[in-house]
Amino acid sequence: MAAAVTWIPLLAGLLAGLRDTKAQQTTLHLLVGRVFVHPLEHATFLRLPEHVAVPPTVRLTYHAHLQGHPDLPRWLHYTQRSPYNPGFLYGSPTPEDRGYQVIEVTAYNRDSFDTTRQRLLLLIGDPEGPRLPYQAEFLVRSHDVEEVLPTTPANRFLTALGGLWEPGELQLLNITSALDRGGRVPLPIEGRKEGVYIKVGSATPFSTCLKMVASPDSYARCAQGQPPLLSCYDTLAPHFRVDWCNVSLVDKSVPEPLDEVPTPGDGILEHDPFFCPPTEATDRDFLTDALVTLLVPLLVALLLTLLLAYIMCFRREGRLKRDMATSDIQMFHHCSIHGNTEELRQMAASREVPRPLSTLPMFNVRTGERLPPRVDSAQMPLILDQH
């Protein structure tokens, strides 16, 4: 009975843990070529009651990845400023991403070490309505990417941009951090921001003001350090500080001509005036060339060998001829030198002079003995005792 009472709470806790690890699933509808922003709120993962607010000291971090893959798709990005702030999944799907994708999000509670999972089912379809062939991209240096992702600042940017564009519906196409486009991390100084690229599309043509800003003359002034050509009032200031030297306009109203598919040929340029076809090469016999290349050096080496042998064997001077060409006085002097040398060698070998006694080994000066002393010198001290 006591064992059953002990196991009941343990099984209840295990079942509760299994129930918590079950991932929630949320279905989201996306459009190709339109910006997608999904906030990762702390309240969604903490599962608090509606009337209970999220404590400001709760720290949550998120990890998102494509199901079956270690990372997110190429078009989708994740950002979170700190564990106290919510995270964001944002991006713009491409036509190749059409269909559905499953994103798994795991939230980690840095205080209680709890783990919560959520599954996002992204249904990506084609946009409805008119096309947006006129697209403009602006670099906003006064904001970070997570400051523009919420709905309120994004709508405020579109409203302010409407004063520079012709009347029409403006839609956000993409939002990209400047760090992802090669920007530098700003210094930790107040007022310094990373910057964000905002891409906007519309069905109405560009205004004269935007065309002048993106003209080559305006870019030339920016390259010289001068302000760009902005002929209208900047309605984006002071809420958004736009770098007007980094404005790009893309007009897709005129379809690009399709590249002609080259027709594969035989690879022979017959009608090219600069093409000189090679002539037919006749068959050649290289036996003669090979024999000349091998035999001529061998014959030359053989002739040189015979010439050297003749000179060394048959053209030598000889001792008799050399002695006959030498005078008698010189020959007598030479012979006397050899004779005296031999005589001195014989005298040195025949003399037997006794060696000095001091040079003999182990000679005793007091006794005159030539034999080694009876006392073993190895056992005698080097310095005798003095009395």
Curated annotation (Swiss-Prot):
Keywords: Cell membrane, Cytoplasm, Cytoskeleton, Glycoprotein, Membrane, Phosphoprotein, Signal, Transmembrane, Transmembrane helix. The keyword RNA-binding does not apply. Striated muscle, both skeletal and cardiac. The modification Phosphoserine is found at S377. GO terms for biological process: membrane organization. Glycans are attached at N174, N246. The chain crosses the membrane at residues 294-314. Residues 24-293 are extracellular. It is a single-pass type I membrane protein. Component of the sarcoglycan complex, a subcomplex of the dystrophin-glycoprotein complex which forms a link between the F-actin cytoskeleton and the extracellular matrix. PANTHER family: ALPHA-/EPSILON-SARCOGLYCAN FAMILY MEMBER (PTHR10132), ALPHA-SARCOGLYCAN (PTHR10132:SF16). Belongs to the sarcoglycan alpha/epsilon family. This is Alpha-sarcoglycan. It comes from Mus musculus. The lineage of its organism: Eukaryota, Metazoa, Chordata, Craniata, Vertebrata. The gene is Sgca.
